[in-house]
């Protein structure tokens, strides 16, 4: 029995000050009943009360909807970009995007009183009522209050502000597993999430939707697509059955194979009893390379299958066209507008191609994933119940799932035949594209390292490895490679603050600190880290890799900060081989 793998009493993970989640929901519903939902330009133009209402109309009429991600350095720049993208579509004679996901800065996840003092990262913050109002009143493109809106300790603040201006889809539930800058109060965070969800539940009859993006949570590092389905069922169980909100399971960015993507999308729809439209299908982000021209092929391949799946099965979703430059930096408005044009052009070809696809094979794969997902879900509730967790308390369920972590969740609840040759202890029903790619990279890296011979060993080195953000697999490749050359690796995890990294380096006597970063904070993070190291007398060498850029005043897009990092004394090796050479 997999319960034998639980070496602790799960009830010990529940904070002693955690209130009853049902009472939190009731408080949220009471708050929500006193909120008046505003009217957006988009909903006014469509003659509907909510985005969900229009999606349900559109799917029955066969009207394709589209979505885009946007979030430049400031809200003013983002607002101007929205106006330019909208005007560009009109000039080209195409339908503008239907919606945009605001990719806000991580500070938005904090309570309002904590945002100004937290370190700036990439993306806009909404600082006042005017900023919020402009979200829905600048152009008739419907916004989702997406990244960093629900999940953090500032969830309730954000939900109330979003509804008042006419935003009827708010996310991101999966981000409740994140850690926000300088925030370690688990109870306050989960209470804010659950209460915000209660507010959304109060507005379900008005078409308000509680959105998730699976890959931003634990599914992003799951090894099995069946676990994706099971996790979505768990989120829906909490959001719909326990809280009473309407739940949508958006997903897609970490899958390259279009057949698999269609099958997983259909599996998510199959476990969606209320047919809440999947808010968006994120475009493929792992097939892109620094060759922007080649990325056009990735874009079209991904869009065509997502759109055909949506059209054939009347899903009412909105695929996202990923700008071809996004692999290296945040795109500017012209690059976002470019792929909106491509997306609309793809729609002209859907009727010509859709009937040539053998959808039976995709449906068979869908059914296999649904079966595995249901088993994952049932395993989770059974094991939690066996361990005396109150599975009717949304706060308890959420916090236990978070504190178990992705690896333990999949080990305990995952399906497939038991097999210790696989990292999670059982053979996946369908291995994820990202895990497959990562393991292939790992094998190639370890093979390359093996050729270095004894002179490549770092057996006398203690190395702290950490990530500034949620990107788990880059850190996994680093730790695997460093362990293979004999280093004592201190895996300090993801979403770490510089002060905490310094403490660990001091406590372990680390020779080096290796940091992976992808959230536009390289310069600020590096500056604070080096300052705190000097104050603590830590002399470890520091290495940083990933996306080494940051927003700077006067630039529409983040700029490279490698030179600044070098001035701080932080090394930026361009490859793992270069890192190993520098560590020696």
Task: State where each predicted segment sits.
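ATP-dependent carboxylate/acyl-activation modules
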Residues: 434-492, 500
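Active-site beta->alpha loop and helix N-cap motifs at the rims of alpha/beta catalytic domains
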Residues: 8-11, 23-225, 551-563
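Cofactor-cradling patches in redox/metallo enzymes
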Residues: 479, 483-485, 490-566
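Long, compositionally biased intrinsically disordered regions
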Residues: 1-27, 337-452, 456-457
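Catalytic alpha/beta core domains of metabolic enzymes, predominantly
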Residues: 171, 176-329, 534-537
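Short acidic-hydrophobic, aromatic-tinged amphipathic segments that line or gate anion-handling sites
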Residues: 569-579
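Short beta-strand/loop segments at the ligand-binding rim of alpha/beta enzyme cores
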Residues: 137-148, 205-209, 272-283, 461, ...
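Active-site-adjacent beta->alpha loops and helix N-cap segments on the catalytic face
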Residues: 125-129, 154-155, 179-195, 256-264, ...
């Amino acid at each position: 029995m997999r319960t034998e793998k639980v070496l602790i009493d799960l009830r010990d993970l529940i904070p002693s000050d955690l209130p009853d989640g049902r009472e939190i929901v009731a408080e949220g519903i009471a708050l929500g009943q006193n909120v008046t939902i505003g009217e957006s330009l988009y909903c006014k133009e469509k003659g509907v009360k909510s985005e969900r209402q229009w999606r349900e109309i559109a799917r029955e009429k066969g009207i394709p909807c589209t979505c885009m991600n946007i979030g430049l350095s400031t809200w003013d720049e983002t607002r101007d970009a929205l106006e330019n993208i909208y005007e560009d579509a009109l000039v080209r004679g195409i339908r503008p995007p239907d919606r945009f996901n605001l990719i806000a800065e991580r500070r938005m996840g904090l309570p309002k009183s904590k945002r100004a003092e937290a370190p700036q990262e990439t993306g806009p913050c909404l600082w006042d009522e005017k900023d919020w109002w402009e979200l829905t009143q600048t152009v008739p493109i419907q916004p989702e209050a997406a990244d960093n809106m629900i999940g953090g300790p500032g969830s309730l603040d954000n939900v109330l502000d979003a509804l008042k201006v006419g935003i009827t889809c708010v996310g991101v539930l999966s981000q409740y597993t994140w850690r926000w800058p300088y925030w370690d109060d688990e109870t306050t965070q989960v209470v804010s999430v659950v209460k915000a969800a209660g507010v959304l539940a109060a507005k379900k009859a008005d078409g308000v939707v509680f959105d998730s993006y699976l890959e931003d949570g634990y599914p992003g590092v799951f090894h099995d697509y069946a676990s994706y389905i099971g996790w979505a069922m768990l989120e829906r169980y909490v959001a719909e059955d326990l809280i009473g909100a309407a739940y949508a399971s958006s997903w897609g960015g970490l899958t390259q194979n279009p057949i698999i993507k269609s099958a997983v999308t259909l599996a998510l729809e199959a476990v969606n009893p209320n047919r809440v439209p999947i808010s968006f299908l994120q475009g493929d982000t792992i097939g892109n390379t620094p060759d922007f021209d080649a990325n056009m092929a990735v874009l079209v391949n991904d869009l065509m299958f997502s759109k055909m799946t949506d059209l054939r099965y009347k899903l009412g979703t909105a695929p996202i066209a990923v700008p071809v430059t996004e692999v290296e930096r945040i795109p500017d408005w012209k690059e976002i507008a470019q792929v909106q044009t491509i997306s609309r052009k793809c729609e002209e070809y859907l009727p010509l191609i859709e009937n040539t696809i053998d959808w039976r094979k995709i449906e068979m794969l869908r059914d296999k994933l649904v079966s595995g997902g249901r088993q994952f879900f049932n395993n989770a509730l059974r094991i939690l119940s066996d361990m005396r967790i109150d599975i009717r308390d949304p706060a308890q369920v959420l916090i236990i799932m978070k504190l178990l972590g992705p690896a333990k969740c999949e080990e305990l609840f995952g399906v497939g035949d038991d097999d210790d040759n696989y990292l999670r202890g059982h053979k996946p029903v369908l291995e994820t594209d990202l895990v497959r790619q990562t393991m292939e990279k790992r094998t190639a890296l370890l093979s390359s390292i093996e050729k270095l011979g004894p002179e490549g060993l770092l057996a006398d080195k203690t190395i702290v490895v950490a990530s500034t953000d949620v990107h788990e697999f880059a850190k996994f490749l680093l730790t695997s490679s460093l362990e293979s050359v004999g280093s004592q690796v201190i895996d300090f995890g993801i979403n770490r603050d510089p002060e905490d990294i310094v403490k660990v380096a001091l406590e372990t006597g680390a020779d080096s600190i290796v940091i992976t970063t992808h959230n536009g904070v390289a310069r600020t993070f590096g500056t604070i880290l080096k300052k705190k190291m000097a104050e603590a007398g830590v002399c470890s060498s520091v290495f940083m890799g990933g996306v080494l850029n940051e927003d700077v005043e006067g630039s529409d897009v983040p700029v490279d900060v490698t030179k600044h990092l070098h001035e701080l004394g932080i090394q930026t090796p361009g490859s793992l081989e270069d890192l190993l050479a520098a560590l020696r």
